[in-house]
Swiss-Prot record:
Enzyme Commission designation: 1.11.1.21
Domain of life: Bacteria
Entry PTM: Formation of the three residue Trp-Tyr-Met cross-link is important for the catalase, but not the peroxidase activity of the enzyme.
Site feature: Transition state stabilizer: R88
Key words, A-Z: Heme, Hydrogen peroxide, Iron, Metal-binding, Oxidoreductase, Peroxidase
Protein name in UniProt: Catalase-peroxidase 1
Binding site for heme b: H259
Catalytic reaction list: H2O2 + AH2 = A + 2 H2O; 2 H2O2 = O2 + 2 H2O
Cofactor note: Binds 1 heme b (iron(II)-protoporphyrin IX) group per dimer.
Pfam families from the UniProt entry: peroxidase (PF00141)
GO terms of biological process kind: cellular response to hydrogen peroxide; hydrogen peroxide catabolic process
UniProt record similarity statement: Belongs to the peroxidase family. Peroxidase/catalase subfamily.
Quaternary context: Homodimer or homotetramer.
Length: 728
């Protein structure tokens, strides 16, 4: 018998064939249980914001400035300065952000984890983070990795003579990888013609993706699928940058500003490069891409395979990028690694070598750099920046700040002495509280006034949910604060039933005006607060209808934003194209409705039990869009009962699909054949999916009514306050 056979631990927990292997289409609830206290090593009472406030930011920056020019033998600095490397590191930390679902970005320091730490576009950034470890180690919990990565990018720019727009801390580290959809391809950098392509039609990029190939941050620098066509590349640039909230001017500023510094690396064939960090051996200690080409570092470094230095001052801020872009004609060539790039025709050798002061090179550019000259719209902006260096510097400073802070949410989350004073429209500004807030007696009186309007439980609950459920935990946007449900574009969204919404808002505005007009000490109630308060009144009334007295918690302090404080285009991405909590689908989608429900729940930071109790409660409260009866498994709507679960689990009912797409079902009495209920995939999943059924059984039990109400109120209150960072 072999020693292997004798070992009682040939296999360990978590290994072997998984449920996903057996049933690849099974609904995945794991995304609802990421980033819990179980994976967080910090003490339960640890408050990162308080820890950051104790940080000597000036001392950290001083250490970072020293690091920039302290070249390490194990990974030497190009041109004796790590600035270019650290700018790239910060850019790639933030640059995964996409507007469609708010996921990606610098917020949790996800560049430390798979898959991002091993993306082909992030080659050598493992070394950048390792260079930072002594500084992170020194300051410990007072600065997160997420904050340090962005701060280092800022300091890199400042150390090279650039004046940044500002810096805000406040990014709390995560301790495990996000579960984000980055595409369906099974091969790194798979071309668009592959079997799992993210493209359809005339190069239409799949939503929510914002990169052209698996493993890239934005675009292929050689051009679409490696085709060195600057005009075609401009299409990809415009699409991907727009999907991370950048317009043409911001895009040009970012590309030109970022490419003012440093160089790319393609000293030899990629075949010399070893496995990425997640595939490397234990002895590599989290590093990857070990190269056997020459020394494998310094002048022999292979990163992208491109060998380009854009400016004659790669460690200093200058206007050289545009000077070179427009001063030369360009001819196609290949890097030593065989990648398509461009070299200036008939040009003098004015570009310094990164490691040999006696050498000079001709200017070089990427295909995507030339897009800024040969795309008509980009060319116009580029020439303006070339002729107006101060305007270019300001545009880059602002675009860099937006890039690195876009996923942080409102300014109230910003920390530190370098937060810029200027309020920016993309931050979704909300006025500061400027009046005394309502007290408990006012809350009780306002609830009575709301109920006296004659608005139904369904109307009150639906409006409050519509206001609050725009929140996205991914980029901290949306939510009830600001009352933007009364403004364009939210007031006109189909999911919000504009005509019905207008009637509810008119009634609530009447209550608001009457209350505010009656005050003598300046006390006011905002409409944002009143919408949430009205929802609470509706929930309490529905619980009372079920025979249970309960008070929904309420904390005043929301304010009303104006239309001028609302970027209509930027707000449009928050429109729910699917909201299973309201049994709503704007269009038929390839993705099953139940998966879209889980996705929505994850953006709302809900757990599976919270998602379950909210769906069951919202159904019986009549919150469906269009007053749809699908999933309203009760004969007493407006009562906060556990009827949804009890009736769904009733074995006297037999369910059958009644639509060609298998997305609508009828529940018939097994004995008589009479139709009792209708439901959607989102409804029936709570009886079909084994884990969700287990949760439904908890709430569908005979003794569950009080627990159901209590849990519903807790989950409801959580959603109502997701954007109340002032309460955290």
């Amino acid at each position: 018998m072999s020693n292997e056979t004798k070992c009682p631990f040939n296999h360990t927990a978590g290994s072997g064939t998984t449920n996903k292997d057996w049933w690849p289409n099974q609904l995945n609830l794991n995304v609802l249980h990421r980033h819990s206290a179980l994976s967080d090593p910090m003490d339960p009472d640890f408050d990162y914001a308080e820890a950051f406030k104790k940080l000597d930011l000036a001392a950290v920056k001083q250490d970072l400035h020293a690091l920039m020019t302290t070249s390490q033998d194990w990974w030497p600095a190009d041109f004796g300065h790590y600035g270019g490397l650290f700018v790239r590191m910060a850019w790639h930390s933030a640059g995964t952000y996409r507007t469609a679902d708010g996921r990606g970005g610098a917020g949790g320091g996800q560049q430390r984890f798979a898959p991002l730490n091993s993306w082909p576009d992030n080659v050598s950034l493992d070394k950048a983070r390792r260079l930072l470890w002594p500084i992170k180690q020194k300051y410990g919990r007072n600065i997160s990795w997420a904050d340090l990565l962005i701060l280092t990018g800022n300091v890199a720019l400042e150390s090279m003579g650039f004046k940044t727009f500002g810096y805000a801390g406040g990014r709390v580290d995560t301790w495990e990888p996000d579960d984000v959809y980055w595409g369906s391809e099974k091969i790194w950098l798979e071309l668009s013609g592959g079997p799992n392509s993210r493209y359809t039609g005339k190069r239409e990029l799949e939503s929510p993706l914002a990169a052209v190939q698996m493993g890239l941050i934005y675009v292929n620098p050689e051009g679409p699928d490696g085709n060195p066509d600057p005009v075609a590349a401009a299409h990809d640039i415009r699409e991907t940058f727009a999907r991370m909230a950048m317009n043409d001017e911001e895009t040009v500023a970012l590309i030109a500003g970022g490419h003012t510094f440093g160089k790319t690396h393609g000293a030899g064939p990629a075949s010399n490069v070893g496995p990425e960090p997640e595939a490397a051996g234990l002895e590599e200690q989290g590093l990857g891409w070990k190269s056997t080409f020459g020394t494998g570092k310094g002048k022999d470094t292979i990163t992208s395979g491109l060998e380009v230095t854009w400016t004659s001052t790669p460690t200093k801020w200058s206007n050289d990028f545009f000077k070179h872009l427009f001063s030369y004609e360009w001819e196609l060539t290949k890097s030593p690694a065989g990648a398509h790039q461009w070299v200036a025709k008939d040009a003098d050798e004015v570009i310094p070598d990164a490691y040999d002061a006696s050498k000079k090179h001709r200017p070089t550019m990427l295909t995507t750099d030339l897009s800024l000259r040969f795309d008509p719209a980009y060319e116009k902006i580029s020439r303006r920046f070339y002729e107006n260096p101060a305007e270019f510097a300001d545009a880059f400073a602002r675009a860099w700040f937006k890039l690195t802070h876009r996923d942080m949410g409102p300014r109230s989350r910003y920390l530190g002495p370098e937060v810029p004073a200027e309020h920016l429209l993309w931050q979704d500004p909300i006025p500061a509280v400027d009046h005394p807030l309502i007290d408990d007696a006012d809350v009780a009186a306002l609830k009575a006034k709301v109920l006296a309007t004659g608005l139904s439980v369904s109307q009150l609950v639906s409006t409050a949910w519509a206001s609050a459920a725009t929140f996205r935990g991914s980029d901290k946007r949306g939510g009830a604060n600001g009352a933007r449900i009364r403004l364009a574009p939210q007031k006109d969204w189909e999911v919000n039933q504009p005509a019905a919404l207008a009637a509810v808002l008119e009634a609530l505005e009447g209550v608001q005006k009457a209350f505010n007009d009656a005050q003598t000490g300046g006390k006011k109630v905002s409409l944002a607060d009143l919408i949430v308060l009205a929802g609470a009144a509706g929930v309490e009334q529905a619980a009372k209808n079920a025979g249970i007295a309960i008070t929904v918690p309420f904390a005043p302090g929301r304010m009303d934003a104006s239309q001028e404080e609302t970027d209509v285009d930027a707000m449009a991405v928050l429109e729910p194209l699917a909201d299973g909590f309201r049994n709503y689908l704007k269009h038929p989608y390839k993705t099953p409705a139940e998966a879209l429900l889980v996705d929505k729940a994850q953006l709302l930071t809900l757990t599976a039990p919270e998602m379950t109790v909210l769906v069951g409660g919202l159904r019986v409260l009549g919150a469906n869009v269009g007053d749809s009866k699908h999933g309203v498994f009760t004969d007493r709507p407006g009562t906060l009962s556990n009827d949804f679960f009890a009736n769904l689990l009733d074995m006297r009912t037999e369910w059958k699909p009644v639509s060609a797409a298998n997305d609508v079902f009828e529940g018939r009495d097994r004995a008589t054949g009479a139709v009792k209920w209708t439901g959607t995939r989102v409804d029936l999943i709570f009886g079909s999916h084994s884990q969700l059924r287990a949760l439904a059984e908890v709430y569908g039990s005979a003794d569950a009514q009080e627990k159901f109400v209590r849990d519903f109120v807790a989950a409801w209150n959580k959603v109502m306050n997701l954007d109340r960072f002032d309460l955290a």
